[in-house]
Each structure stands twice: as structure tokens, then as C-alpha cells.
């Protein structure tokens, strides 16, 4: 997912750069890039103009080789259409669907939360001074630090990125409370939806805590830079498409929970291979929580597909066309202007979270929600949305193969990128 979002953003940028090249070859390349974007579901607002037989100046080329359709008026109209599309989900009859599903949520979502006395806490997974005494705590910390020395920098960067994402929990609870019909309107509502939000937040809160404590004890990281990154991310917030629609929001969170489980699970396996059993246990425990949370959100979207299939599949297509924007996409350490892209590239390179994982998650959700089997109750728009979603994994697969082939032909070499989290040591990544 990280890789897909980064790739598509850079591809859009490349189209604009190519427009300044006063040759037909540049126009053809840019047209090919735009075509790839369109095939993947991301439309471009620009199209190539007809070329002249005489070679124009660079300035003239900038002005004439590409024409932007509709300019600002078209962009405003497009944004208005997008907003109108998802705002239709806020109609009373649509929100009543969620209100009627509250007893279902009570029976099928809340049981996936565990009582505080039954779940792990950070002190269960790390040395506890009160339990071990001064000498025992000191010895346990020395052992933890010795094992942490074996974890490569690439995995440390991915670990910090995951931890920063987890620590921005206040943003995610705020996001959940923007969903109409399911939000916690008073902060202490007794509805099943509101109790789920608070219970989910309580479980998620342990994830950033335990990772932060491990990092402090390990001595491998510049914790002040890590903490500044968390501070900036929470202050920056996050942007999500269709922010008030529970249909779109639940699709987004179902995808995100599975992505987080995959990322933490991969990290656990990798660091175990490098000898850090304590960190592997921590990441494995977090991944287990995320699997339960994924199950809850996957269930509620499956129920929406059952009771309102046309609206559900159109919401899914809407989100996939605009990409599942990562919650930590606005992360900033105050030094690297492209920090998230570099973190995403490190995750791709290390195999912690890859484009293939993004595709696999999409394929999994298509199966879980039986999207391919949808037929009855679909409008023409719903059928087109179904066909788009079901065709998307293969399009992503072809994009992966073409990107891999191009990289092999170009013999592209990794680029060393310094990360402030690890005292500006470089990590080699493949940049788009």
C-alpha cells in the first residue's frame, strides 16, 4: 500500500515534468504514464496537445504541449461531483441502515474486544523494575539491548514508522467519531457503536506504548527525533476520503487493520530471525490484536454488502479509485521533506509491507465480501463498481511486473537515505 501510493504520486509528478520536454517522445511517454494512471483508476486532468512540425521553444512547449481540461473550473466541478457522490450516503434512509444494525454490532463486534484484565499490557512484555528489583531489571535491560543490536537498521526504520503510526491514535479515534450514525456523540454513549470505538481505542493504545518503551530500552534510536515525529503527525492529522460516511469509513478501516496486522506480523518474523525474541513477541502480540480488529470491521462491511449491496460496492470502488491513503502519510520529522515516501520505500525494500501485500489484501477482501458474486440488487453504477473492483488486483499485478522489468532493464541501484530516527544512518532503498 505504501509503495502503491508513493508510486502513483511520483508518476503523476513525472507527467508534469515530461510536459516540459519539447519532443514527441516526451509527449508519448507522458501519454503512456497517463494511460497507466487511468487503467489503475486514477484519472489525469491533462491531455497532450497536437504537436507542431517545427521545434518550439522550451517556454512555448511548457504552454502548449499539454492542455489541462477545464483548468480550475473543471477541477472545482470534479471535486464537487466527488463530494456529492459520498454525501449521498448521509441521506436519512442510508444512515437508518446503520441504526438498524446496532443490535447486530452488539452481538457480532463487541465480543471481539477483550476485557482489560484479560489482555496483555506493555509491562507483561518488557522488563518491569518493580517485579525484578534493581539488579534483575538491570540484567534484563542489558539482555534486551544485546539482542536489539542484531536488528538491522532497515527493520528499525520500519519499526519506528509502525510505532509512529500507532502513536497517532488520537487522530484515529477522532476520525471514527466523524462517521454519521455510528459516532460517539457525547464521549460516553451507551450504543454498541460508541462502545466499540472506545474499546477499540483502549486496545490500540497499548501498541504505541509498548513499542515506545522497547525503543527507549534498546538504545538503538534517537528517541527525541522519534517523539518529535509523533508530535508532528498528531498535529498534522490525516486526510481521508468521504470522512463522514460510515460505508466508506468501514471499508477504509477494514483494509487498514489487515495492512497493520501484515506489517507487524512480517516485522515479528524478521526480527526473530535476527535473534530479537522480545521484539518478535511484542510485534506478534500487536499483530494478534490487529487481526481481531480486522475481523470486526470486515464483518460490518460484509453485513453492509448483505443488506445494501449496491451502496456497499460503490463505496468500496470509490475508496479504491482514490487509494487507501495511509493514516501516517503526513508524518514529518522536521528534516526529511519526503519522510513518508522514504519510510514506505524502506518497508517495500525490507519486505515489511509491499505492493504485493496491498494487492493480496484487496484480493482477500474481495473474497470475504463475495464481491464477484454480487448480482441482485445492483444498479448499473453498482455493476460497474463491482467490475472495477474485481479487475483491480490483476491490474496491480501487471503494474508490479512492468515496474520490476523496467527496474531490471535499467539496473537501478538502491539509494542510501539517511533517517533521523537512527541518528542519520543511511538505509538503502529503491526509489521510484
Which residues are covered by each model-predicted region?
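Non-heme di-metal
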Residues: 2-21, 29-33, 37-47, 54-55, ...
Amino acid at each position: 500500500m505504501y509503495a502503491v501510493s508513493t508510486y502513483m504520486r511520483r508518476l503523476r509528478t513525472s507527467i508534469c515534468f515530461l510536459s516540459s520536454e519539447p519532443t514527441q517522445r516526451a509527449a508519448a511517454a507522458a501519454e503512456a504514464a497517463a494511460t497507466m494512471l487511468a487503467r489503475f483508476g486514477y484519472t489525469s486532468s491533462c491531455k497532450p496537445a497536437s504537436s507542431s512540425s517545427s521545434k518550439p521553444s522550451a517556454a512555448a512547449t511548457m504552454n502548449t504541449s499539454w492542455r489541462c481540461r477545464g483548468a480550475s473550473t473543471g477541477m472545482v466541478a470534479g471535486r464537487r461531483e466527488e463530494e456529492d457522490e459520498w454525501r449521498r450516503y448521509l441521506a436519512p434512509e442510508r444512515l437508518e441502515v446503520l441504526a438498524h444494525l446496532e443490535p447486530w454490532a452488539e452481538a457480532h463486534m463487541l465480543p471481539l474486544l477483550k476485557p482489560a484484565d484479560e489482555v496483555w499490557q506493555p509491562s507483561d512484555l518488557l522488563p518491569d523494575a518493580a517485579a525484578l528489583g534493581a539488579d534483575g531489571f538491570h540484567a534484563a535491560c542489558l539482555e534486551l539491548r544485546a539482542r536489539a543490536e542484531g536488528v538491522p537498521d532497515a527493520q528499525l526504520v520500519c519499526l519506528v514508522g509502525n510505532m509512529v503510526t500507532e502513536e497517532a491514535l488520537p487522530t484515529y479515534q477522532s476520525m471514527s467519531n466523524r462517521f454519521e450514525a455510528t459516532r460517539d456523540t457525547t464521549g460516553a454513549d451507551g450504543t454498541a457503536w460508541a462502545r466499540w470505538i472506545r474499546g477499540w481505542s483502549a486496545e490500540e493504545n497499548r501498541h504505541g506504548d509498548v513499542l515506545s518503551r522497547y525503543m527507549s530500552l534498546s538504545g538503538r534510536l534517537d528517541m527525541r527525533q522519534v517523539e518529535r515525529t509523533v508530535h508532528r503527525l498528531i498535529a498534522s492529522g490525516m486526510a481521508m476520503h468521504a470522512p463522514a460516511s460510515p460505508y466508506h469509513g468501514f471499508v477504509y478501516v477494514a483494509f487498514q487493520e489487515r495492512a497493520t496486522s501484515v506489517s507487524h506480523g512480517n516485522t515479528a518474523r524478521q526480527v526473530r530471525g535476527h535473534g530479537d525474541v522480545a521484539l518478535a513477541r511484542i510485534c506478534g502480540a500487536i499483530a494478534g490484536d490487529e487481526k481481531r480488529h480486522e475481523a470486526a470491521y470486515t464483518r460490518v462491511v460484509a453485513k453492509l454488502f448483505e443488506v445494501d449491496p449496491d451502496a456497499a460496492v460503490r463505496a468500496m470502488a470509490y475508496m479504491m479509485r482514490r487509494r487507501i491513503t495511509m493514516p501516517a502519510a503526513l508524518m514529518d520529522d522536521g528534516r526529511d521533506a519526503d519522510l513518508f515516501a522514504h519510510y514506505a520505500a524502506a518497508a517495500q525494500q525490507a519486505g515489511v509491507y509491499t505492493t504485493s501485500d496491498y494487492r493480496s489484501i484487496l484480493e482477500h477482501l474481495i473474497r470475504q465480501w463475495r464481491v464477484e458474486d454480487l448480482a441482485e440488487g445492483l444498479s448499473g453504477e453498482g455493476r460497474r463498481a463491482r467490475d472495477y473492483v474485481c479487475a483491480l488486483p490483476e491490474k496491480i499485478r501487471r503494474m508490479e511486473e512492468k515496474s520490476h522489468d523496467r527496474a531490471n532493464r535499467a539496473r537501478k541501484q538502491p539509494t542510501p537515505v539517511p533517517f533521523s530516527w537512527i541518528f542519520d544512518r543511511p538505509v538503502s532503498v529503491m526509489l521510484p
